[in-house]
Amino acid sequence: MATEEVNKPQSLPPYPEMIVKTLEALNEPNGSNKSAISKYIETTYGELPDATVLGSHLNKMKDSGELSFKQNNYMKADPNAPPKRGRGRPPKPKTPLPPGTVVSPPRPRGRPPKDPNAPPKSPKAKATPGSGRPRGRPKKVPRSPAVAAPTAVSSGRPRGRPPKVKPQLTEVSVES
C-alpha cells in the first residue's frame, strides 16, 4: 500500500488553467500554436497523460469564447470583445405584460391524474360493425367422424392442369 502512494505522479492543475498560464507566459503577439503550447506545458509540468486531451480542451475553450483562434494560433480572448452570437435565429422579444395581471403557472407535462371523487362512468354499448360477422378469424368447427360429408359428383374431368398434348408420330416410309 505504501508503494502506491510513493509512485503516484503529482496532480496536474486543470487543463484550462494550464493553457491560460501558458499563453500568458509565452506572451506572443500573434498567439501561440498548439505545438508551442504543448511543449511549454511538458517542460513546466512534466509528462502529459495524452496529447489529444490538450487539443480537445483547446477546442472547448475556443468554442466557449475563452480563447480566440486566428491563423492556426490560440490567444486569450479580448475581454472587451462582444460575446459570440449563438447559432440559429434569436428568440423574439417578449411583450411586457401590463402591471397587475396575474400570470398563471404553465400547465404540467403529461396526462392529468384522475379525480378520485368522480362518479364511475357507465359502460359504453359496443358499436356493432356494419356486417353481422364477428371480428378476426372464425373458429374451427370440429367435424364429427360419424357424419361423412357427401363427396361432390365428378363431372368426368380430373382435377388440375391437363397434360400437354403430344403430337402423334406418323410412320414415314423411305423409298430409294
Curated annotation (Swiss-Prot):
Segments for region (Disordered): 64-176
GO BP: chromosome condensation; negative regulation of DNA recombination; nucleosome assembly; regulation of DNA-templated transcription
Domain of life: Eukaryota
Keywords of this entry: DNA-binding, Nucleus, Repeat
Biased composition (Low complexity): 143-157
DNA-binding region: 84-92, 106-114, 132-140, 156-164
GO molecular function, one term: nucleosomal DNA binding
Compartments, as annotated in UniProt: Nucleus
Family: Belongs to the HMGA family.
Protein name: HMG-Y-related protein A
